[in-house]
Amino acid sequence: MGSSSSTALARLGLPGQPRSTWLGVAALGLAAVALGTVAWRRTRPRRRRQLQQVGTVSKVWIYPIKSCKGVSVCETECTDMGLRCGKVRDRFWMVVKEDGHMVTARQEPRLVLVSITLENNYLTLEAPGMEQIVLPIKLPSSNKIHNCRLFGLDIKGRDCGDEVAQWFTNYLKTQAYRLVQFDTSMKGRTTKKLYPSESYLQNYEVAYPDCSPVHLISEASLVDLNTRLKKKVKMEYFRPNIVVSGCEAFEEDTWDELLIGDVEMKRVLSCPRCVLTTVDPDTGIIDRKEPLETLKSYRLCDPSVKSIYQSSPLFGMYFSVEKLGSLRVGDPVYRMVD
């Protein structure tokens, strides 16, 4: 662990060694804080809180299609279901099999090579060896509604048409696929369904993201990880929405409530990592080992919260949006404290 990381731990009252010990303390702290927040979300009266700047927003990404390339933006709205740039929302589109089951880069790694351009009311998709295709953001209401399946939960999606379905089928060359779009008239996946045994978590809905409306990582945490890897990785391996500079490695583990721009966020959980992190975003090749194995060597959770994270290493944080608004690259990131 680097000296800057040790400084952060000392400042936060956590011991520098061993790593597993302070990770356990941080995880227990997360559970304790969450247990006290049942009635927090939009029900408690506003209280005066101090603001402590902990960093600066250095990057913002929106991922319109789940598992495809992210779109870097300078400014974004934060809705209760995640980021939005104009009419395009984060992970509101998803590739599915013909039976409605989701398809991600875990099964089709080359999805990460599909790039997306936002222009007016259209998405333009490009991929290696394929002609670009233009997809309207607003779909005809007559398009079929599919019953989809995402991590064992039911959710609906409106079919995006035969042309783009054939485009993905031709590109991936394994079986027939469809592209579906979520709209806000549909029912999202709720906290109670995502984590039925964790009743202390604040209530929110998501469309096609894995777990939460916002995913945040610090630059310093990636730097720390790269000191342990033979082959360095970049932030795109981890697909965050917000990247923060100016803090120390894994300091984001301790952030409970944040103010960025005029957006207030509440910590939900740490981000458990899976084999998707081993897909190279530049080649679409899945390694299945790194950086996941290295993360497992020093970023496992405390046994007390193993029911949530199992054997997945933790890297990055999930947040819910408590006060809607907008934020932009360059905004200070404030930790809100009593």
Swiss-Prot record:
The keyword Cytoplasm does not apply. Coiled coil: none annotated. Pfam families: MOSC, MOSC_N. Residues 1-35 form a transit peptide. InterPro entries: MoCF_Sase_C, MOCOS_middle, Pyrv_Knase-like_insert_dom_sf. It is found in: Mitochondrion outer membrane; Peroxisome. This is Mitochondrial amidoxime reducing component 2. It comes from Mus musculus.
